[in-house]
From Swiss-Prot:
One GO-annotated biological process of the protein: fatty acid beta-oxidation
E.C. no: 4.2.1.149
GO molecular function: hydro-lyase activity; L-carnitine CoA-transferase activity
Name the record gives this protein: Carnitinyl-CoA dehydratase
Pathway: Amine and polyamine metabolism; carnitine metabolism
Catalytic activities: (R)-carnitinyl-CoA = crotonobetainyl-CoA + H2O
Gene: caiD
HAMAP family in the record: CaiD
Keyword check for Lyase: yes
Catalytic residues of the enzyme: 111, 131
Presence of the UniProt keyword Lyase in the record: yes
Enzyme class, broadest EC rank: lyase
Keywords: Lyase
Species classification: Bacteria, Pseudomonadati, Pseudomonadota, Gammaproteobacteria, Enterobacterales
SUPFAM superfamilies named in the record: ClpP/crotonase
Length: 261
């Protein structure tokens, strides 16, 4: 792995630290490497949760590396199989990802965080999509994912003017899950990751699958869809060993031992 990415395995939790001075900006090469990391995480049966963060205390990521852009890297360059930053276009990742946002998350950096399932941010974090001021658009998920979270008026202001949103405002709008001090950020993200590990892996996979496939459906149609047998994880979890283990462990007043089958 390159010097730009530091990987740490803590049991079933993978920590990924983006380290590209000065702003943790991402060029196509780094994006490819991040994609390899996330795809390996997806396919590794021993890993359950990933945490992505940035090195330092100022930048989570400034997004696309404008120095690379100035040197000829195109906005529509090939950023790898996972899309920009390796995660924004992985649509079959049924394991949770936590973005531990340690500072500015601008442009593609914000889009990377939005592609995660949870955002825990430091109180000095700030979020923005300034692409329109650079003559481009936030097409690595920002213009697609943010409208699913925020009202149109707020989205329009952010994507058309590049307005920044601070940590507390992001919490009020439900963009982030938690706001903590910089010193507590990684411990808090790890605590959340462990809570996820404590849940059954097949259940987590089924939940992500259901969210992904039914989010645009009316409730009645979604009911029919999930019961039609076309989903991979949902039918499996209903007849799994874990579905037996959970109630049994509860009755026996012990922690469940998940097998993922």
């Amino acid at each position: 792995m390159s010097e730009s990415l530091h990987l740490t395995r803590n049991g079933s939790i993978l920590e990924i630290t983006l380290d590209r001075p000065k702003a943790n900006a991402i060029d196509a090469k780094t994006s490819f490497e991040m994609g390899e990391v996330f795809l390996n995480f997806r396919d590794d049966p021993q890993l359950r949760v990933a945490i992505i963060t940035g090195a330092g205390e100022k930048f989570f990521s400034a997004g696309w590396d404008l120095k690379a852009a100035a040197e000829g890297e195109a906005p529509d360059a090939d950023f790898g199989p996972g899309g920009f930053a390796g995660l924004t276009e992985i649509f079959n990742l049924d394991k949770p990802v936590i973005a531990a946002v340690n500072g500015y998350a601008f442009g593609g950096g914000f889009e990377l965080a939005l592609a995660a399932d949870f955002i825990v941010c430091a109180d000095n974090a700030s979020f923005a999509l300034p692409e329109a001021k650079l003559g481009i658009v936030p097409d690595s998920g920002g213009v697609l994912r943010l409208p699913k979270i925020l009202p149109p008026a707020i989205v329009n202001e952010m994507v058309m003017t590049g307005r920044r949103m601070g940590a507390e405002e992001a919490l009020r709008w439900g963009v982030v899950n938690r706001v903590v001090s910089q010193a507590e950020l990684m411990d808090n993200a790890r605590e959340l990751a462990q809570q996820l590990v404590n849940s059954a892996p097949l259940a987590i996979a089924a939940l992500k699958e259901i969210y992904r496939t039914t989010s645009e459906m009316p409730v009645e149609e979604a009911y029919r869809y999930i019961r039609s047998g076309v989903l991979k994880h949902y039918p499996s979890v209903l007849h799994s060993e874990d579905a037996i283990e959970g109630p049994l462990a509860f009755a026996e007043k012990r922690d469940p031992v998940w097998k993922g089958r």
